[in-house]
């Protein structure tokens, strides 16, 4: 079980790394736009424009390549830390009830799930950043065209047009394009990918441990500011494998009620909720 506060801050180191990449990319783009000052409105415009767009694309690819190794190492470190923390918290519950779960480090099933979670999260990261070069170069190209059009119209001088283009990119620059067409900054995309990967992997480990220990009931965590669809089921108790009435209490079906296993549900996209094992017949879990 991972606390919401832990999940909220888990991606911080990785996000900082990609914030630095964002800053480097924006500085490079601004520098290239400023070179418009040395040109006449029509002198070799198309050739220069093409060369600059290609240069931006290549520079972005190089910057991302330098960052990828650091990112993969941080993802692996974070996944190991989060998985260990989740299992320690979950196993405390089992020990409280006199049960003996196998050590996490010695459990081949759990270790395989952890490795699969790392591979999936790293793969998601690669997919997100794979579009960055084209996304950035496309925005750079559009900014050049807008600035060039302003100058040619006679309404702006080069200095004003360049400043406007740079300021606009600084305020609205996007780096990642999803298949749906939605765009994000690298910071937002990285945080979402890591948070989702860490929480989903921890959840799969907890489900596997529950299978091992014969657990039938789960309770979800709760935190302030939950999205309305999640507030409906946070802090409640559920039964795995269908709704039941047990010891005078109704327990809704875990997956059906929480949407666990779907992107929009428990432990889905950007979700900071998780769950833990309970044994209604044995009393409340440890605080």
Q: Residue ranges of each PLM-predicted region?
A:
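N-terminal leader/targeting and assembly helices and adjacent pre-domain segments
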Residues: 1-171, 176-177, 281-287
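Extended non-catalytic scaffold regions that mediate assembly and binding
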Residues: 178-182
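Acidic, glycine-rich two-metal-ion catalytic cores of nucleic acid-processing enzymes
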Residues: 184-284
